[in-house]
């Protein structure tokens, strides 16, 4: 199942983040999950209730030719080691691009 996590669920992806990004310190993870995740949209793929793949859409304000727009950049792109090479991330990327197009995001 592919879906966006609700605000109160975002902490569920911390274990996957730590597996995928072992170089990130505990302090950084604490900061990121407390402060940066507030505005993120976290798109996940779940199998049997477990998050197996995720990506984070971070909103970013851009200025171009005198205009301002909000554009998401993608971070936290990861899949459990056991779930790799199964097309999980491909399905998330396609869903995200479709959503961003529907939102008319630049």
Regions found by a protein language model. Name each.
Residues 1-53, 57-59, 66-73:
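Short amphipathic alpha-helix that is part of the acyltransferase structural core
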Residues 64-66, 86:
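Intrinsically disordered, low-complexity acidic/polar segments
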